[in-house]
Regions:
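N-terminal accessory segments
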Residues: 1-39, 68-71
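Generic non-transmembrane alpha-helical segments
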Residues: 11-20, 61, 65-69, 127, ...
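Glycine-rich N-terminal segment of FAD-binding domains in flavoprotein oxidoreductases
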Residues: 30-100, 115-117, 136
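Alpha-helix N-cap recognition
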Residues: 55, 235-238, 277
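FAD-binding subdomain of flavoenzyme oxidoreductases
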Residues: 102-106, 111-257
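Active-site beta-loop-alpha junctions enriched in small/polar residues
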Residues: 259-261
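Acidic, glycine-rich loop-and-beta core segments that form the ion-binding/anion-interacting portion
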Residues: 263-265, 273
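Conserved small/polar residues in nucleotide/adenosyl-binding loops
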Residues: 270-277
Length: 277
């Protein structure tokens, strides 16, 4: 039987301040409101407090304290998700990973990178591309979403057609468990047959099994050239038949997207109106 969660009190606030400093503990109305929503439509749950640790040690101490006091913790990143995964439905603590935002190491020899979960997807992609390396997962919010959130949701984008999604590029994770224990889930190798596959268990778990504090990503060589084609079809059926024909011909496009005439007309109209004003 699940015990009733405890409310955050003054003693709890003082304890959090002692762990991470008063500048990283927030309980003002404006901050609580900002962290009560993500991009999920018409959902809002207010936390009782927002805390912003900077490393796994601080997170471990916070989790141990909350575990002892039965205070719920909801980890969050950039809050760009559409499934409500970062919403504190039980109140309690919202733990933001935004200060864990370092690209720790780029291992060009082994095509790997070690990063913290608060790094923005596009910032990471641009960083590795300067070294002729490629991190393919490209969710629609890549300009603002955090890599930690991508892991929590197993995010992907149009390029998943050829390259796969987030889970296909994760080698190893540092995770703080609900007990406060800090573990690594795997090894920095492509083939690892030792024990349970804890790395993939954590990917897509939406913060319910632990808080990810470091990630080792696999990278691939940057494609030398990209070509974009726009092909009109007289019907949706013909477009779908073309997709099947492309794959049967042995071609593997990076992405394929379908646009209806109404959508194209709307974009054209908006572009025209922008020039008129």
């Amino acid at each position: 039987m699940i015990k009733k969660y405890s409310k955050v009190n003054k003693t709890d606030i003082d304890s959090f301040i002692e762990i991470i400093g008063k500048n990283n503990v927030f309980f003002d109305e404006e901050t609580l409101k900002n962290y009560s929503t993500d991009h999920t439509e018409n959902l809002s749950f207010f936390p009782e407090i927002v805390i912003k640790p900077i490393n796994s040690i601080e997170i471990s101490k916070i989790i141990k304290y909350c575990n002892k006091r039965l205070i719920p913790i909801t980890p969050c990143g950039a809050r760009t998700g559409l499934s409500g995964g970062s919403l504190p439905i039980y109140g309690g603590v919202t733990l933001s990973t935004e200060r864990l935002n370092k690209i720790i190491e780029l291992d060009k020899r082994n095509l790997q990178a070690t990063v913290e979960p608060g790094v923005i997807n596009k910032v990471f992609k641009d960083f590795v591309e300067k070294e002729n390396l490629f991190y393919p997962p490209d969710p629609a919010s890549q300009g603002s979403c955090f890599l930690g959130g991508n892991l929590a949701e197993n995010a992907g984008g149009p390029k998943a057609l050829k390259y796969g999604v987030t889970k296909d590029y994760v080698l190893n994770l540092e995770v703080v468990l609900p007990t406060g224990e800090i573990i690594w889930t795997g090894a920095n190798v492509l083939k690892n047959s030792t024990g349970y596959n804890l790395t993939q268990l954590m990917v897509g778990s939406e913060g319910t099994l632990g808080i990810i504090t470091k990630v080792v990503f696999k990278l691939i060589p940057l494609p030398k050239k990209t070509i974009t084609l726009l092909v009109p079809f007289k019907s949706a059926e013909l477009a779908c038949e073309a997709v099947s024909a492309i794959f049967r011909a042995g071609l593997n496009p990076c992405s394929l997207e379908f646009m209806e005439r109404d959508a194209i007309n709307s974009v054209s109209y908006t572009h025209l109106r922008a020039h008129e004003t």
